[in-house]
């Protein structure tokens, strides 16, 4: 059986880049606790699909949805186009496209929008993965990997695109303030085939802990998205990242010292710190997750693809190296993959 391989990774962001001080001013917070969410986040800059010349914080639900649609199609299409180009493919070479997002929805679905924008074949197969939160890039990546295992001659692309700036909610909840302090916009795409030149995707795995179902997600008062984010997420998430890492390693006869690279979702400063503690990882092994958080913020599902791209750009992986790629999402769920260069 063919082992799927990563042929290329690409990312895209909105054209507008904001520093934390600017976003804090836009949020209107003036109490020390909420201001601290911004200053203690480790984040320096974020890209947001918000034109500073026209944005106002009193958007209607319809205006939010339209901004999400424009941003998701624009940024998602850019990421897919770059991944296809980096893989050395033509647009008509793509046999399968998987799209995913949790910050908005459109019908016809996001995959149909991108197929039209890029002029992909009319026979391209596709699937859209929705509402699996920050872990959804890994869920979509698994669908693409499974497709390539079943059809080894096919060339497939996964794209995770999030416009988190279209999911803000102005109220007095601390959860909302945390969301405003960390979430950002971006898209990450991965091209996968049976003959790619990048790392092999050796195994995918999912772990659910339904007792934490309400710890993270969205609710929709008045039709407007509002983040649900329990303070327990950093504890739950770190523990589940370790559980996922242990499961992937044990199933393949590996130990922590055998893993050369950790591609971990940049959920937030405290989550990264807690992961380092429970998994006994030094700063060097968390460097790419920290760097992405610092420069881009938490882009929900797209973030882990940015971390993978950051690692690949560093040139650190060598033939024979093992890597773990793990993200967290509502459910509560950990989604992971074992990679081999």
Enumerate the language-model features and the residues they cover:
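Claisen-condensing/thiolase-fold acyl-transfer catalytic domains that form or cleave C-C bonds
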Residues: 103, 116, 121-123, 128-152, ...
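Short beta-strand segments
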Residues: 7-10, 100, 130, 157-162, ...
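Condensing-enzyme catalytic core mediating Claisen C-C bond formation in acyl metabolism
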Residues: 1-70, 170-239, 243-247, 328, ...
């Amino acid at each position: 059986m063919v082992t799927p391989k990563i042929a290329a990774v690409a990312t895209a962001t909105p054209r507008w880049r904001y520093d934390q001080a600017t976003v804090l001013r836009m949020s209107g917070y003036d109490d020390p606790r909420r201001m601290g969410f911004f200053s203690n986040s480790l984040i320096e800059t974020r890209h947001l699909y918000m034109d500073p010349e026209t944005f106002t914080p009193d958007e209607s639900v319809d205006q939010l949805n339209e901004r999400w649609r424009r941003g998701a199609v624009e940024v998602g299409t850019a990421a897919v186009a770059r991944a296809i180009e980096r893989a050395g493919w033509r647009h008509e070479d793509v046999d399968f496209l998987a799209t995913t997002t949790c910050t908005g929805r459109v019908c016809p679905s996001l995959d149909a929008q991108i197929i039209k924008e890029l002029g992909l074949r009319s026979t391209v197969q596709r699937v859209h993965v929705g509402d699996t939160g920050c872990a959804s890039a890994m869920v979509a990546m698994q669908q693409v990997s499974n497709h390539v295992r079943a059809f080894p001659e096919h060339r497939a692309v996964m794209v995770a695109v999030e416009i988190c700036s279209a999911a803000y909610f102005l109220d007095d909840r601390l959860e909302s303030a945390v969301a405003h302090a960390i979430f950002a916009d971006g898209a990450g795409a991965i091209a996968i085939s049976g003959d790619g030149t990048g790392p092999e995707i050796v195994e995918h795995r999912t772990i659910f802990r339904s007792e934490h179902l309400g710890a993270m997600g969205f609710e929709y008062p008045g039709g407007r998205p509002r983040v649900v984010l329990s303070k327990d997420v950093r504890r739950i998430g770190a523990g589940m990242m370790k559980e996922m890492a242990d499961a992937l390693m044990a199933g393949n006869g590996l130990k922590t010292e055998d893993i050369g690279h950790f591609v971990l979702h940049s959920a937030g400063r405290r989550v990264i710190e807690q992961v380092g503690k429970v998994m006994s990882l030094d700063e060097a092994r968390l460097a790419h997750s920290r760097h992405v958080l610092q420069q881009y913020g938490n882009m929900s599902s797209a973030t882990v693809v940015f971390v993978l791209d950051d690692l690949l750009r560093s040139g650190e992986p060598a033939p024979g190296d093992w890597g773990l790629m793990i993200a967290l999402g509502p459910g509560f769920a950990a989604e992971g993959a074992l990679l081999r260069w």
